[in-house]
Amino acid sequence: MSDLSPERFKLAVTSPSSIPESSSALQLHHSYSRKQKSLGLLCTNFLALYNREGIEMVGLDDAASKLGVERRRIYDIVNVLESVGVLTRRAKNQYTWKGFSAIPGALKELQEEGVKDTFHRFYVNENVKGSDDEDDDEESSQPHSSSQTDSSKPGSLPQSSDPSKIDNRREKSLGLLTQNFIKLFICSEAIRIISLDDAAKLLLGDAHNTSIMRTKVRRLYDIANVLSSMNLIEKTHTLDSRKPAFKWLGYNGEPTFTLSSDLLQLESRKRAFGTDITNVNVKRSKSSSSSQENATERRLKMKKHSTPESSYNKSFDVHESRHGSRGGYHFGPFAPGTGTYPTAGLEDNSRRAFDVENLDSDYRPSYQNQVLKDLFSHYMDAWKTWFSEVTQENPLPNTSQHR
């Protein structure tokens, strides 16, 4: 946390800076491909999957497979969420879900930590200034004193290079960078809007290596995307330079998250191909209702096409009057024997129905084709003659003798 006063913070917010990469990154964010890969959209989908009742554990491998991204992208989101208390690390690639209700407590802790950090840095700077004045007086009185005696003093501080290296290594952490970024807003009432460039200068310092500075600015921009998707900050721009900036909104209740259209289409494809069986009951209800409708339609058609008994008997009598009686009708060489037709009464004016089993047993026609009868009798006589000759020449062995 920086030890700048509120007046200097105001100047830092409104002062222009020269980092063109951040503005170009914001322009790329509005393109289609960049938007689909942004951490903001990914965080919205992540929260839509896990911000609901019944979720206690979050697995990074499971989240990466459901969202269709690499696990390192999930790490970025989890680090930011962990810094504001939404998640807590439990094991490797396993996190405990705390929810948005833990955000106010985490922000309060960050505010208290930021105030203590500001007071500590102010106290250290005052001590360093006093020790520098004493060192100047001693060096003027003893110009040839060795550096070892200075380092052996009990009140001397360690060299500034070592703690700066430690701080630089710690600030590479995305979670720590997120906490320091939030402290800029909650530890000073003067700051409510800050540009991305000024936040990078306050948190990262003036780096001489431009490539390292670009990387750190991109990391800070990813943090801002995640916090913006959580409605903690809002993307805006400065009034003087129109550069990208961020406005602090704070925690105003739990927001509502919905899956993106791409993931919704993916879920619909899964249901279509049978990998998701949540719509089995719907399919069964549809099939049962359709079968009932088809059965009803068939019954209506049968009633519509059914012939009353009186009309059926009338048409049958007309047919007999045209072709004569059943006894006088000639069926050709295959004349059926005399038989009676079933005279069972009709029910519900439906079509006359014949009993198939009774037809097979009682009303089997007896064909009287003399030519075929003579031919079959000739074949039977020939077979009997051949069989008698064969049995006489080769008599069958007596099976009783072998017993």
Curated annotation (Swiss-Prot):
Predominant localisation class: nucleus
A GO MF term: DNA-binding transcription factor activity
Regions recorded as binding DNA: 34-99, 169-250
Keyword Transcription: yes
Protein name: E2F transcription factor-like E2FE
Source domain of life: Eukaryota
InterPro entries listed in its UniProt record: E2F, E2F_WHTH_DNA-bd_dom, WH-like_DNA-bd_sf, WH_DNA-bd_sf
Tissue specificity field: Expressed exclusively in mitotically dividing cells. Highly expressed in young leaves and mature flowers. Lower expression in young stalk and in young and mature flowers.
Species of origin: Arabidopsis thaliana (Mouse-ear cress)
Listed GO CC annotations: nucleus; transcription regulator complex
Region (Disordered): 128-167, 282-319
GO BP terms, alphabetized: DNA endoreduplication; negative regulation of DNA endoreduplication; regulation of transcription by RNA polymerase II
Family, similarity comment: Belongs to the E2F/DP family.
